[in-house]
C-alpha cells in the first residue's frame, strides 16, 4: 500500500476530486494549506497598495491505495491538476506498512 499526498492549486481541486471519484477512488483526506515552491509568491493590489503574498493557498489531498493503483491515481491527479504554469503542485508517494479500520478491526488492503 502507498499513501499519496498531493499538493495542488485550490482552484483545481474540484477537478482532481471529480477525476478520482469517477474512477472509484472515494476515500481521501483533504486539508486547506498554504505554501510555496520555486514560483515564490505573487504581488496583489489591495486598497491601492501592492502587497507581496509569499504563501499561496493550496489543497493537500491524502489518499491510501493498493500498490497496483498508484500509477493510475498519479495519472488522474496530474492530468486534472495540470495548468503548465509554476505552482501546479507536487505529489509524494509514501510506503504504508499497515492500515487498521477502527470500526471493524480489518487490516491491510481489506481495510481500504
UniProtKB/Swiss-Prot annotation:
InterPro entries: N-reg_PII (IPR002187), N-reg_PII-like_a/b (IPR011322), N-reg_PII/ATP_PRibTrfase_C (IPR015867), N-reg_PII_CS (IPR017918)
Keyword flag Cytoplasm: yes
Keywords, alphabetical: ATP-binding, Cytoplasm, Nucleotide-binding
UniProt-annotated binding residues for ADP: 29, 38-39, 64, 87-90
Keyword Membrane attached: no
PANTHER family, alphabetized: NITROGEN REGULATORY PROTEIN P-II, NITROGEN REGULATORY PROTEIN P-II HOMOLOG
Family stated for the protein in its record: Belongs to the P(II) protein family.
Protein name: Nitrogen regulatory protein GlnK2
Species of the source: Archaeoglobus fulgidus (strain ATCC 49558 / DSM 4304 / JCM 9628 / NBRC 100126 / VC-16)
Amino acid at each position: 500500500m502507498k499513501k499519496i499526498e498531493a499538493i495542488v492549486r485550490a482552484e483545481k481541486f474540484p477537478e482532481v476530486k471529480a477525476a478520482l471519484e469517477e474512477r472509484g477512488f472515494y476515500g481521501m483526506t483533504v486539508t486547506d494549506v498554504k505554501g510555496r515552491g520555486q514560483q515564490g509568491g505573487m504581488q496583489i493590489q489591495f486598497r491601492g497598495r501592492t502587497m507581496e503574498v509569499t504563501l499561496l493557498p493550496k489543497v493537500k489531498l491524502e489518499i491510501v491505495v493498493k500498490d497496483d493503483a498508484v500509477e493510475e491515481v498519479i495519472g488522474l491527479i496530474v492530468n486534472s491538476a495540470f495548468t503548465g504554469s509554476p505552482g501546479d503542485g507536487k505529489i509524494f508517494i509514501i510506503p504504508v506498512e499497515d492500515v487498521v479500520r477502527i470500526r471493524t478491526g480489518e487490516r491491510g488492503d481489506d481495510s481500504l
